[in-house]
Amino acid sequence: MSFHHRVFKLSALSLALFSHLSFASTDSELNLDFLQGMSAIPSVLKSGSDFPAGQYYVDVIVNQENVGKARLSITPQEESANALCLSPEWLKAAGVPVRLEGYASTLNAAGQCYVLSRNPYTRVDFSYGSQSLVFSIPQSFLVGKTDPSRWDYGVPAARLKYSANASQTSGQSTSAYANADLMVNLGRWVLASNMSASRYADGSGEFTARDITLSTAISQVQGDLLLGKSQTRSALFSDFGFYGAALRSNSNMLPWEARGYAPLITGVANSTSRVTISQNGYAVYSKVVPPGPYQLDDVRSVGNGDLVVTVEDASGHKTTTVYPVTTLPTLLRPGEVEYNVAVGRKSSNYKLKKPFADGENGMFWMGSVGYGFDSTTLNAASILHGKYQAGGVSVTQALGGFGAVSAGMNLSQAKYDNGDNKRGHSVSAKYAKSFSDSSDLQLLAYRYQSKGYVEFADFYSTDRYTRYNTKSRYEMRFSQRLGNSNLNLAGWQEDYWWMKGKAIGGDVSLSTTILDGVSVFLNGSYSKRPYLDKPDYSTSLSFSIPFTLGGVRHYSSTGLSYSSSGRMGMNSGVSASPTDRLSYGLNTNLSDKGDRSLSGNLSYGFDAIQTNMMLSQGRDNTTVSGSVSGTILGTADSGLMMTKETGNTLGVARIPGVKGVRINGSAPTNSKGYTVVNLSDYSLNRVSVDMENVPDDLELQTTSFNVVPTEKAVVYREFGAEHVLRYILRVKERDGRILNGGSAQTEQGLDAGFIAGNGVLLMNMLSAPSRVSVERGDGSVCHFSVKGIVPNTGKVQEVYCE
């Protein structure tokens, strides 16, 4: 009998029977007198048969979480032993995240399988009625959802992720720009390069390749190894491009709940208790802990604001503790390590040009490390080069209700070709404070650089003059939430060693919602630099009003703007997205200088490509422009494919020969059954078939896969499928009496199903049988012909014994 991905309606007798089996004690004896016309009692109905032999398609449930579906074959030996022996391959394919080293004592050496239920703390239960296999496994015996043992590096693949646009203005030449990311996957390695091409209105053009890296993930050090041209990464020094090798940590490799900063929550539970953590009125964590001390180090990343920890014990008594939290980017979790080691030759520009020949002569070495203690984070970094040396340290301290503060200092020494030497230092300080759930001083920063301080990113031994070398800089950012309103303020001031005067600037933005959905936005900016005669400023006010037209939600927008150039403008428009593929808009612009324009845009996402077109009519010219984006992807299995998906980590899924089925909301499968889905790297992704468009005559061996892809991987999964012939038959004797009970077989001896009490037989066959036999209780056999019976009608059809 083949497997089912659809659930058929059971007869009232079947429902009652399975309900009884589900709630009855395993020691109770089921009265089988109601079964008539059967020569044998199925094992599923016998008392004590927890694992009746047979072929099943079950939901796999681990610790109350459904992890997917799987084929399950129970042998007569397992039925007799009343225990399942599961192979490592089956457990992995079914998505059971178990550490088998903890079950060494349950290994059946002859069958190379594990009888997990022999462990006193583990249960494996099979439910025939719900067709599910339920595991109860101690937490210490489980593999984490994103454990490196579950990482999938993908299949060999090549892809080109692209975006391009072009425009044509009347009376001018066409201008165009294209950007592409080329990636080649081979084993655990990924070769990646970014490139762009431009064509300007004057007819000139340019092609640029920016970088090229060969990288691989290394789980043992929770980081990436990169070879080629890339960028450094450090919390203390400015980043710069280089040719060489780097080994650096990757926080995305951590479980989702361990990414970003969160304080360590500790306490003592008097009894089995539930610990709930909330922030800004929302629960962000909840866990049941046993009596005694507890330590919660898996609270997912939080922002600024008080954490309210509520402990509810077995009697219902609650105690509450408040943890004031303010974060800074350099603040790490307790025990978290961040590192970066790079060696190579500094590049002089952003282009991939003359590798190991451009840039600063000589090799450099850079190393940085950060470590998180309970409430303190230490960072240190160093750069060594024949003509440049620098070192730096910083301390970031969480102050609880007083916020968080960071202080750091760098020293540098530079030697120039003309014999000059520069020595200097840089000091910095940052402070952040959350005053309430709605008010944050996001950042108050100060940085001072002495006259001789030089960043390696700005160092060139042939040029000792650093233009506009910053002396000091102050910076402030503040945010305030007031009901439906958000206010953001930012300001900065800096001065320079080689120039008199100061540069100042600031931004303000206010957004609010009024009158049941009307959005209002107010923005303003100001800047004044010593090398410009006049300040630069601008302000704008805009409204967005939703309305429904023809059953489609539209948005009408109106805006006013004014800038320091003395230009005042007004714009008005309407936009809508009727479907997830289609969006459109119409806009008009006016200015006090007499300029005016009318433009319309249309975007549509095809299965293979995302497109956009725009037509603009000005007072003196007409402009037509368009853009496209997508990915061209090739694997050995799928061949060449085009998709509008542009993620860095992708999955290629296939249902062989089945067209028009979506997977994870993807574009429909093509004529060969392939489609492409976006995936999140180092996270548990469930790749599931959307069942709405699956043909009725198709049976899937599985409907979902769990994958944990590495960054930039192309993962391949195939959903086994069979086209089946479904028959719903009511079997009757020659005189018209309903035949109750009995197992049916085809002329080839294949199992064709079991006749229910109302004479209904559900047959699911891979090929059309011509004749079916049913053994009666007295030993006689009923034969009936299936010739002329049409499969897959969804209707009950009657057949008669011959």
From Swiss-Prot:
Residues 1-24 form the signal peptide. It comes from the Bacteria. Keywords: Cell outer membrane, Disulfide bond, Fimbrium biogenesis, Membrane, Plasmid, Signal, Transmembrane, Transmembrane beta strand, Transport. It is found in: Cell outer membrane. The keyword Transport applies. One of its GO terms (biological process) is pilus assembly. It is a multi-pass membrane protein. The keyword Transcription does not apply. Belongs to the fimbrial export usher family. This is Outer membrane usher protein PefC. The gene is pefC.
